[in-house]
Structure formats: C-alpha cells, structure tokens
C-alpha cells in the first residue's frame, strides 16, 4: 500500500472514481440507445481537435472538446437527413478527424509532438486540472440524469413513444450527444483515443448480465468501471505496462469471469 503515499497515485484513484461515474452514467445511455458506433466515431474525431490545439498552441484537450462536440452535432444532424445514412455520416467525421489530427500535428511548430499520450493515455499523468474537469462533468451528468431520468429512459428505449408523450426528443438527443463528446474528451488522458470506447461499453455489458433496469445498470456500471480501473492500475504498476491498456484488459477480464460464472450457474440450475 506504499503506492497510496504518492500524489500521482492519489490523483489516479480519484480520477478513476470520477471517470467511472461519468462513463457509467453516459455509457448506459449509449449502450441502451445503441450508439456505440457513433461514440467510436466521435472518439476518433476528437483527434482532429487535438492536432488543431497542438498547431495553434492552445490546450489540446480544450480544442478536442470543441471539435468533438461539433462533430457530435454534425453526426446527429447528418444522420437525420434522408440523403445520407447514419453510418456514412459517422465515417465522414471519423476519418476527417483522424486526417486533420495527423496533418495539424506534423504542421505544429517546433519538435514533433508525442501523440502516444493522446492515443493510448496514461492515467498516472492526470493532474488537478483534469480532476476538476472530471469532477464538474460527473456532477453535471449526475444532476442532469437525476432530473430527467424518465424522458432519457423513454428516448433510449423508444423514441416514437417519447414523442407521443410530448417529450422534446431532438433537444434531449443533442444535449446527450454533447455529454457523450465531453465525457470522451475528459477521459482521454486515462485510456486514450484508441481505447476510450471500451470504457463506455464494457462495464455496461457486464452490468447487463445481472439486470435490465436502466438505473441499476448505471449503478453497477460505476462500480464495475471503478473496479476495472483499480485492477488496471495495479497491473500497470507491477507489470510496468501502459495503464490504459491494463485498465481495459482487467475490465474485459471482469466481464469474462461474470459471463462464465453466470453460464455455470444456469447449467447447475
């Protein structure tokens, strides 16, 4: 337990908890609404904002947040048009973001930037500014879902029913897309662009093995996500491997154990 004496590890633990709250809440909506592919597109589109930030000399996380939100709105708008399929709209922003990110990164003045931190992440490098960002996002998400859980659940399961109940579906969908983009960007320092989509889906998949209740999946996802981060952190420390990859590995291991355990229980019963 000597690790707990180090400030960087304390930051990593607190960041894991806050990120688990944010990912557990918005990830449940993503999985229920079947927006995993869209979220993957937004994740990779954020690379364009990172490249733009490096080129302009501003915070890459700030520029990635703006770029991701605009990309999310763009995907949502294009997918509503009759002349373009949703998967095609996602592909446009996915590839555009990656292309712009690479171009701007190499056009940045001075030495070529190290992009691995943004591609693969390192939770041990998060600082107080990152913690404040995660904390504010987790607080806003918690409040938003607490106040509007009923319309969110209605939209997630049946948009047409939600419309029949006079719920402003389009407004909620744009707001939720914004939250998806901001959550992805807020956690880039943890697992990076390549692996971020996993934190939005694996804890929810594991929770879904035990319950179909939207609210219960949120709570279980937060706990499972935090457990995955803790296990990944200790694997990273003892095996000297990247923390982002080890977090995802341990999260998938939890899912596999739960899946096998549930199957064994079914056979015995």
What kind of region is each of these model predictions?
Residues 241-248, 252-269:
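Cytosolic-side transmembrane-helix boundaries in multi-pass membrane proteins
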Residues 190, 194-245:
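Transmembrane alpha-helical segments in multi-pass inner-membrane proteins
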Residues 13-18, 61-66, 91-92, 131-136, ...:
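Hydrophobic alpha-helical transmembrane segments
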Residues 15-24, 45, 49, 53, ...:
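Alpha-helical transmembrane segments in multi-pass membrane proteins
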Residues 131-202:
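Helix-loop-helix "hairpin" substructures at the membrane interface of multi-pass membrane proteins
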Residues 1-21, 269:
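Membrane-interfacial amphipathic/re-entrant helices at transmembrane-helix boundaries
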Residues 6-11, 82, 90-148:
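Transmembrane helix-bundle core of multi-pass membrane transporters
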Residues 28-111, 207-219, 238-239, 263-265:
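Short loop segments and helix-boundary regions at transmembrane helix junctions
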